[in-house]
Amino acid sequence: DIYQVYGYKTLPTSNLYAFSIERSHQLMHDNSQIGMIIPISAFANSSMEELQQLFKSEFGRMYISTFHQRPAQLSDGVLQRLSIFITTKHNSEHTIFTTGINRWYTETRDKLFCLLSYVESPQIYQPHFVKLGSKIEVDIFNKYVLHTPIRCYIGGNDNPNNSLYYRTAGGGYWVTFLNAEFDCVSVSNKHTVIREEVIAKALSAALNSNLFWWYYSINFDLFNFKDYMIFGFQFTYTDQKSLDSIIKLSDQMETSLRTNAIYYSINSVTNGLNETVTYQKFKSKEIMDAIDKELTKVYEFTEEELDFIINYDIKYRMGDELNE
Protein backbone atom coordinates (compact mmCIF):
# COMPACT_ATOMS: atom_id res chain seq x y z
CA ASP A 1 0.00 0.00 0.00
CA ILE A 2 2.94 2.36 0.46
CA TYR A 3 3.23 2.66 -3.33
CA GLN A 4 -0.51 2.97 -3.99
CA VAL A 5 -1.72 6.07 -5.86
CA TYR A 6 -4.93 7.67 -4.59
CA GLY A 7 -7.23 10.48 -5.68
CA TYR A 8 -6.08 10.84 -9.30
CA LYS A 9 -8.53 11.36 -12.15
CA THR A 10 -6.25 9.29 -14.38
CA LEU A 11 -6.21 6.23 -12.08
CA PRO A 12 -8.23 4.06 -14.53
CA THR A 13 -5.41 4.32 -17.08
CA SER A 14 -3.10 2.37 -14.73
CA ASN A 15 -0.19 4.19 -16.31
CA LEU A 16 2.61 5.98 -14.50
CA TYR A 17 3.11 8.70 -17.11
CA ALA A 18 -0.58 9.64 -16.85
CA PHE A 19 -0.17 10.09 -13.09
CA SER A 20 2.99 12.14 -13.67
CA ILE A 21 1.21 14.46 -16.09
CA GLU A 22 -1.69 14.96 -13.69
CA ARG A 23 0.67 15.67 -10.79
CA SER A 24 2.70 18.06 -12.95
CA HIS A 25 -0.48 19.97 -13.75
CA GLN A 26 -1.17 20.34 -10.02
CA LEU A 27 2.31 21.79 -9.49
CA MET A 28 2.24 24.19 -12.43
CA HIS A 29 2.14 27.96 -11.94
CA ASP A 30 -0.65 29.72 -13.83
CA ASN A 31 1.84 31.14 -16.34
CA SER A 32 4.07 28.10 -16.68
CA GLN A 33 4.38 25.63 -19.54
CA ILE A 34 5.02 21.91 -19.67
CA GLY A 35 6.28 19.51 -22.32
CA MET A 36 6.85 15.76 -22.36
CA ILE A 37 7.61 12.90 -24.74
CA ILE A 38 5.04 10.12 -24.28
CA PRO A 39 3.65 7.19 -26.34
CA ILE A 40 1.17 7.94 -29.14
CA SER A 41 -1.35 5.75 -27.33
CA ALA A 42 -1.75 8.47 -24.68
CA PHE A 43 -3.65 10.56 -27.23
CA ALA A 44 -5.12 7.73 -29.27
CA ASN A 45 -6.39 4.67 -27.41
CA SER A 46 -9.60 4.24 -25.43
CA SER A 47 -7.65 2.87 -22.45
CA MET A 48 -6.23 6.38 -21.96
CA GLU A 49 -9.53 8.25 -22.09
CA GLU A 50 -9.19 9.76 -18.59
CA LEU A 51 -5.85 11.30 -19.55
CA GLN A 52 -7.33 12.62 -22.79
CA GLN A 53 -10.16 14.23 -20.82
CA LEU A 54 -7.58 15.81 -18.51
CA PHE A 55 -5.72 17.29 -21.47
CA LYS A 56 -8.91 18.71 -22.96
CA SER A 57 -10.39 20.11 -19.76
CA GLU A 58 -7.45 21.16 -17.58
CA PHE A 59 -4.79 22.46 -19.98
CA GLY A 60 -4.67 25.51 -22.22
CA ARG A 61 -3.21 26.01 -25.70
CA MET A 62 -1.58 22.74 -26.72
CA TYR A 63 0.86 21.65 -29.43
CA ILE A 64 1.11 17.93 -30.21
CA SER A 65 3.60 16.45 -32.67
CA THR A 66 3.60 12.75 -33.56
CA PHE A 67 6.48 10.51 -34.63
CA HIS A 68 6.38 7.00 -36.02
CA GLN A 69 9.09 4.42 -35.32
CA ARG A 70 9.64 3.43 -38.96
CA PRO A 71 11.66 3.84 -41.04
CA ALA A 72 13.61 5.65 -38.28
CA GLN A 73 13.07 6.31 -34.58
CA LEU A 74 12.94 9.55 -32.64
CA SER A 75 15.71 8.23 -30.37
CA ASP A 76 18.12 5.52 -31.45
CA GLY A 77 17.34 2.23 -29.78
CA VAL A 78 13.86 3.31 -28.67
CA LEU A 79 11.47 1.45 -30.96
CA GLN A 80 8.34 3.37 -29.98
CA ARG A 81 5.74 5.53 -31.67
CA LEU A 82 5.91 8.78 -29.72
CA SER A 83 4.20 12.13 -29.27
CA ILE A 84 5.63 15.37 -27.92
CA PHE A 85 3.20 17.76 -26.27
CA ILE A 86 3.82 21.33 -25.16
CA THR A 87 1.05 23.11 -23.31
CA THR A 88 0.08 25.67 -20.69
CA LYS A 89 -2.09 25.51 -17.62
CA HIS A 90 -5.78 25.99 -18.36
CA ASN A 91 -6.83 29.49 -19.38
CA SER A 92 -9.48 31.07 -21.55
CA GLU A 93 -7.74 29.84 -24.71
CA HIS A 94 -8.04 26.11 -25.26
CA THR A 95 -6.82 25.67 -28.83
CA ILE A 96 -5.15 22.46 -29.97
CA PHE A 97 -2.56 22.36 -32.74
CA THR A 98 -1.30 19.07 -34.17
CA THR A 99 1.08 17.71 -36.75
CA GLY A 100 0.38 14.74 -38.92
CA ILE A 101 2.31 11.51 -38.41
CA ASN A 102 5.97 12.23 -39.07
CA ARG A 103 8.10 9.56 -40.74
CA TRP A 104 11.67 10.05 -41.91
CA TYR A 105 14.84 8.28 -42.92
CA THR A 106 17.93 8.36 -40.71
CA GLU A 107 19.83 10.65 -43.08
CA THR A 108 17.18 13.40 -42.73
CA ARG A 109 16.95 13.25 -38.91
CA ASP A 110 18.72 16.60 -38.42
CA LYS A 111 15.96 18.38 -40.39
CA LEU A 112 13.05 16.68 -38.65
CA PHE A 113 12.09 19.39 -36.15
CA CYS A 114 12.76 22.24 -38.57
CA LEU A 115 10.13 20.83 -40.92
CA LEU A 116 7.35 20.30 -38.38
CA SER A 117 4.11 21.94 -39.42
CA TYR A 118 1.12 22.43 -37.10
CA VAL A 119 -2.52 23.08 -37.88
CA GLU A 120 -5.40 24.08 -35.61
CA SER A 121 -7.16 20.78 -35.17
CA PRO A 122 -10.83 20.06 -34.34
CA GLN A 123 -10.97 17.72 -31.34
CA ILE A 124 -14.65 17.80 -30.42
CA TYR A 125 -15.97 14.74 -32.26
CA GLN A 126 -14.26 12.03 -30.20
CA PRO A 127 -12.68 11.62 -26.74
CA HIS A 128 -9.21 10.96 -28.16
CA PHE A 129 -7.08 13.30 -30.29
CA VAL A 130 -6.85 13.16 -34.08
CA LYS A 131 -3.46 13.72 -35.72
CA LEU A 132 -4.13 16.23 -38.49
CA GLY A 133 -1.24 18.02 -40.16
CA SER A 134 -2.62 20.38 -42.80
CA LYS A 135 -5.67 22.45 -43.71
CA ILE A 136 -6.69 19.95 -46.38
CA GLU A 137 -6.75 17.21 -43.75
CA VAL A 138 -8.98 19.35 -41.56
CA ASP A 139 -11.33 19.88 -44.52
CA ILE A 140 -11.42 16.14 -45.25
CA PHE A 141 -12.01 15.36 -41.58
CA ASN A 142 -14.89 17.83 -41.29
CA LYS A 143 -16.66 16.11 -44.21
CA TYR A 144 -15.82 12.61 -43.04
CA VAL A 145 -17.29 13.01 -39.52
CA LEU A 146 -20.75 13.76 -40.94
CA HIS A 147 -21.19 10.07 -41.79
CA THR A 148 -22.44 7.00 -39.92
CA PRO A 149 -20.10 4.64 -38.04
CA ILE A 150 -20.01 1.17 -39.57
CA ARG A 151 -20.84 -0.34 -36.17
CA CYS A 152 -24.43 0.79 -36.82
CA TYR A 153 -24.66 -1.79 -39.63
CA ILE A 154 -23.57 -4.76 -37.51
CA GLY A 155 -26.05 -7.42 -36.42
CA GLY A 156 -28.48 -10.11 -37.48
CA ASN A 157 -28.29 -13.86 -37.84
CA ASP A 158 -24.93 -15.39 -38.69
CA ASN A 159 -24.67 -15.24 -42.47
CA PRO A 160 -21.23 -16.12 -43.92
CA ASN A 161 -22.25 -14.56 -47.24
CA ASN A 162 -22.92 -11.15 -45.70
CA SER A 163 -20.07 -10.77 -43.24
CA LEU A 164 -16.77 -8.92 -42.98
CA TYR A 165 -13.62 -11.01 -42.56
CA TYR A 166 -10.50 -9.40 -41.13
CA ARG A 167 -7.47 -9.90 -38.91
CA THR A 168 -6.69 -8.07 -35.69
CA ALA A 169 -2.93 -8.64 -36.01
CA GLY A 170 -0.30 -8.11 -38.69
CA GLY A 171 -0.73 -6.29 -41.97
CA GLY A 172 1.50 -3.31 -41.28
CA TYR A 173 0.68 -0.58 -43.80
CA TRP A 174 -1.86 -2.83 -45.53
CA VAL A 175 -4.81 -3.94 -43.41
CA THR A 176 -6.99 -6.37 -45.35
CA PHE A 177 -10.72 -7.09 -45.36
CA LEU A 178 -12.28 -10.00 -47.22
CA ASN A 179 -15.78 -11.01 -48.29
CA ALA A 180 -15.24 -14.68 -47.42
CA GLU A 181 -13.24 -16.72 -44.95
CA PHE A 182 -9.44 -16.58 -44.83
CA ASP A 183 -7.53 -19.39 -46.54
CA CYS A 184 -5.77 -20.40 -43.34
CA VAL A 185 -6.56 -20.72 -39.65
CA SER A 186 -5.28 -18.08 -37.21
CA VAL A 187 -6.29 -16.85 -33.78
CA SER A 188 -6.34 -13.33 -35.23
CA ASN A 189 -8.90 -14.23 -37.93
CA LYS A 190 -12.29 -12.68 -37.15
CA HIS A 191 -15.60 -12.09 -38.84
CA THR A 192 -18.52 -9.82 -38.12
CA VAL A 193 -22.06 -10.27 -39.42
CA ILE A 194 -23.72 -7.35 -41.20
CA ARG A 195 -27.47 -6.63 -41.11
CA GLU A 196 -29.32 -8.27 -44.00
CA GLU A 197 -30.53 -4.97 -45.49
CA VAL A 198 -26.91 -3.82 -45.88
CA ILE A 199 -24.59 -5.36 -48.48
CA ALA A 200 -21.40 -6.28 -46.62
CA LYS A 201 -19.32 -5.99 -49.80
CA ALA A 202 -19.92 -2.23 -49.88
CA LEU A 203 -18.54 -1.94 -46.35
CA SER A 204 -15.62 -4.21 -47.23
CA ALA A 205 -14.68 -1.95 -50.13
CA ALA A 206 -14.80 1.15 -47.92
CA LEU A 207 -12.61 -0.56 -45.31
CA ASN A 208 -10.09 -1.55 -47.99
CA SER A 209 -9.75 2.06 -49.17
CA ASN A 210 -6.94 4.55 -48.74
CA LEU A 211 -9.48 6.63 -46.80
CA PHE A 212 -9.71 3.93 -44.16
CA TRP A 213 -5.91 3.87 -43.80
CA TRP A 214 -5.96 7.65 -43.31
CA TYR A 215 -8.76 7.32 -40.73
CA TYR A 216 -6.91 4.60 -38.82
CA SER A 217 -3.63 6.53 -38.92
CA ILE A 218 -4.95 9.86 -37.65
CA ASN A 219 -7.05 8.31 -34.89
CA PHE A 220 -5.08 5.47 -33.32
CA ASP A 221 -1.63 4.29 -32.26
CA LEU A 222 -0.72 2.41 -35.48
CA PHE A 223 -0.01 -0.74 -33.47
CA ASN A 224 -3.28 -2.05 -32.07
CA PHE A 225 -6.08 -3.00 -34.45
CA LYS A 226 -9.21 -3.58 -32.41
CA ASP A 227 -12.87 -3.92 -33.31
CA TYR A 228 -13.82 -0.50 -31.92
CA MET A 229 -11.17 1.05 -34.16
CA ILE A 230 -12.40 -0.76 -37.26
CA PHE A 231 -16.12 -0.24 -36.78
CA GLY A 232 -15.74 3.36 -35.71
CA PHE A 233 -14.97 4.13 -39.37
CA GLN A 234 -17.71 6.39 -40.73
CA PHE A 235 -19.40 5.51 -44.02
CA THR A 236 -23.00 6.23 -44.96
CA TYR A 237 -24.64 3.23 -46.58
CA THR A 238 -27.41 4.51 -48.84
CA ASP A 239 -28.77 1.69 -51.01
CA GLN A 240 -27.45 -1.09 -53.21
CA LYS A 241 -28.16 0.67 -56.50
CA SER A 242 -26.22 3.84 -55.70
CA LEU A 243 -23.33 1.76 -54.33
CA ASP A 244 -23.28 -0.74 -57.21
CA SER A 245 -19.89 0.44 -58.51
CA ILE A 246 -18.35 0.13 -55.04
CA ILE A 247 -19.74 -3.39 -54.67
CA LYS A 248 -18.22 -4.40 -58.04
CA LEU A 249 -14.86 -2.98 -56.93
CA SER A 250 -15.15 -5.02 -53.75
CA ASP A 251 -15.35 -8.18 -55.87
CA GLN A 252 -12.31 -7.04 -57.88
CA MET A 253 -10.38 -6.39 -54.68
CA GLU A 254 -11.26 -9.86 -53.37
CA THR A 255 -10.00 -11.51 -56.56
CA SER A 256 -6.80 -9.43 -56.57
CA LEU A 257 -6.01 -10.12 -52.92
CA ARG A 258 -6.44 -13.86 -53.27
CA THR A 259 -4.60 -14.04 -56.61
CA ASN A 260 -1.55 -12.20 -55.23
CA ALA A 261 -1.50 -13.97 -51.87
CA ILE A 262 1.63 -15.84 -50.76
CA TYR A 263 1.15 -19.16 -48.99
CA TYR A 264 3.85 -20.63 -46.78
CA SER A 265 4.43 -22.91 -43.80
CA ILE A 266 5.75 -22.05 -40.36
CA ASN A 267 7.16 -24.75 -38.09
CA SER A 268 7.33 -23.68 -34.45
CA VAL A 269 8.23 -25.60 -31.30
CA THR A 270 4.99 -24.61 -29.55
CA ASN A 271 2.45 -24.96 -32.38
CA GLY A 272 4.13 -27.34 -34.81
CA LEU A 273 3.61 -26.97 -38.57
CA ASN A 274 1.09 -24.31 -39.60
CA GLU A 275 0.00 -23.01 -42.97
CA THR A 276 -0.34 -19.24 -43.28
CA VAL A 277 -0.99 -16.66 -45.96
CA THR A 278 0.13 -13.08 -46.61
CA TYR A 279 -2.03 -10.83 -48.77
CA GLN A 280 0.13 -8.50 -50.87
CA LYS A 281 -2.37 -5.69 -50.81
CA PHE A 282 0.07 -3.19 -52.27
CA LYS A 283 -0.42 -5.02 -55.58
CA SER A 284 -4.07 -3.99 -55.43
CA LYS A 285 -3.33 -0.26 -55.09
CA GLU A 286 -5.04 0.65 -58.37
CA ILE A 287 -8.26 -0.97 -57.16
CA MET A 288 -7.93 0.86 -53.84
CA ASP A 289 -7.60 4.14 -55.72
CA ALA A 290 -10.68 3.31 -57.80
CA ILE A 291 -12.62 2.65 -54.57
CA ASP A 292 -11.60 6.06 -53.24
CA LYS A 293 -12.77 7.72 -56.45
CA GLU A 294 -16.19 6.16 -55.91
CA LEU A 295 -16.17 7.12 -52.22
CA THR A 296 -15.64 10.74 -53.27
CA LYS A 297 -19.29 10.75 -54.38
CA VAL A 298 -20.37 9.61 -50.91
CA TYR A 299 -18.24 12.07 -48.93
CA GLU A 300 -18.31 14.90 -51.51
CA PHE A 301 -14.54 15.30 -51.52
CA THR A 302 -12.92 17.66 -54.01
CA GLU A 303 -10.37 16.46 -56.58
CA GLU A 304 -7.60 17.94 -54.44
CA GLU A 305 -8.88 16.11 -51.37
CA LEU A 306 -9.14 12.85 -53.32
CA ASP A 307 -5.56 13.25 -54.51
CA PHE A 308 -4.42 13.74 -50.91
CA ILE A 309 -6.24 10.60 -49.76
CA ILE A 310 -4.93 8.40 -52.59
CA ASN A 311 -1.36 9.54 -51.97
CA TYR A 312 -1.51 9.60 -48.17
CA ASP A 313 1.63 7.99 -46.72
CA ILE A 314 2.41 6.56 -50.16
CA LYS A 315 6.18 7.13 -49.96
CA TYR A 316 6.46 4.76 -47.02
CA ARG A 317 3.60 2.41 -47.87
CA MET A 318 4.76 1.64 -51.40
CA GLY A 319 8.53 2.01 -50.90
CA ASP A 320 10.46 0.53 -53.83
CA GLU A 321 7.21 -0.25 -55.65
CA LEU A 322 7.04 3.44 -56.62
CA ASN A 323 10.24 3.05 -58.62
CA GLU A 324 9.09 0.06 -60.66
Language-model features, listed with the residues they occupy:
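Basic, amphipathic alpha-helical recognition segments used for DNA target recognition
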Residues: H191-G232, D239-T259
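Generic, well-ordered alpha-helical scaffold segments in large soluble proteins
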Residues: R23-N31, I40, L54, E58, ...
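Short helix/loop capping segments that flank catalytic or ligand/cofactor-binding pockets
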Residues: T95-I96, W174-L178, K201-A202, F308
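Signature of N6-adenine DNA methyltransferases within the class I
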Residues: D1-N159, F177, D183-S188, F223-K226
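Polyanion-binding interface signature
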Residues: H147-C184, K190-I199, S209-L211
